[in-house]
Amino acid sequence: MRFVSAGALAACLWAVVVAAPQNPPPPPPPPVPTVTPTATVTPLPAVTTPTVTPTPAATPDPTPTVSFDDWLTAVRAEAVTRGIKEATLDLAFTGLTPDPVIIARDRTQPELTQSLDDYVTARLNPKTLARAAEVARTDKDVIERVRATYGIPGPIMVAIWGLESNFGQFTGVRPVITALATLAYDGRRPALFRSELFQALAIVDKGLVNLPEFNGSWAGAIGQPQFMPSSFLKYAVDFDGDGKIDIWTSPADVLGSMANYLKTAGWTEGARWGREVKISKTVMAKIEKAVPMRSTGCRARREMTQARPVSEWRDLGVLEMDGTKLPAASLSASLVRGQKRNFLVYQNYQAIIEYNCSNAYAVSVGLIADKIARETPAK
């Protein structure tokens, strides 16, 4: 959800990506945070390892048991024990109040309120695909340098870039500290967002951004890759070698940081993410009896089946989209089901899920990347 501005036309083409369809167009991008040169960034101890846009299972709308002021007092005390300076906390917490708009957005994420089929259809329209292909051609040199370093295909990086921030057109206008404090206090995922709040405070405390300019998404995601603060501290890189990590305005740092994340998440160079498959009602009934769903992990992981060799899916009657048989391969694959569309997904798909735990999102990334690869083949 962040990137180098490509003009009003790109914003129009990708508007559906950066907001739910019923919302009005996003406001103009906020001032770009000032990034201070840094060689090595060490994150504070984290409670969890979140995805870029966290979507773990949530409890049903719990009510906070203490006042926000009392809660913030406790958070401040813990922040001090984590090494955050009092002066930073004074700046960050003075006048801080929860934002009800952020709570509303958390309840209406398109990945959660739209079906997989509808979400994918909305993103894979001709205009968005054309824009992605254009970016793949325009930025091919830096994309190739990043690919050579990390082994992540250019089309995958471009697809994520577009879905996250419309190639930098919209990186968020919500104050990050306010967003994270609101979500941590809300109580649906307190450990996750409390941890991210401390990481965000560390970013400010280290002087990596100026607090008045530290804006992001409603979930506290920052920069063109829409990294959560902990991900910024762990995975963001100075790929252009100018002495600072800048995921707000440097395409090289943006792409390098995304690629570093995916490589760390287990992306295997040269392997596919998955494929769309054809499944009849009779075959689906057999699958439901023979292949259990996963029972652990974030919501997206629990919405896919356990892994089976492609050869086993072949034996169950799963077909290629043209009606031919699947290869008799030992490659491990899980089934992701939509209302009408179905996908066998491989290990590289799991790396995309690590970036954003939503099957609708991950399938969209894969399909957009496939389209880009067909239109801009490697030389």
Regions found by a protein language model. Give the residues of each.
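Substrate-binding/active-site groove segments that recognize
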Residues: I177-A184, L197, I222-V237, M258
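Bacterial N-terminal signal peptides
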Residues: A6-V16
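Signal peptide-directed extracytoplasmic domains
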Residues: A92-R145
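Compositionally biased, proline/threonine/alanine/serine-rich low-complexity intrinsically disordered stretches
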Residues: W14, V18-T73, A77, E86-D90, ...
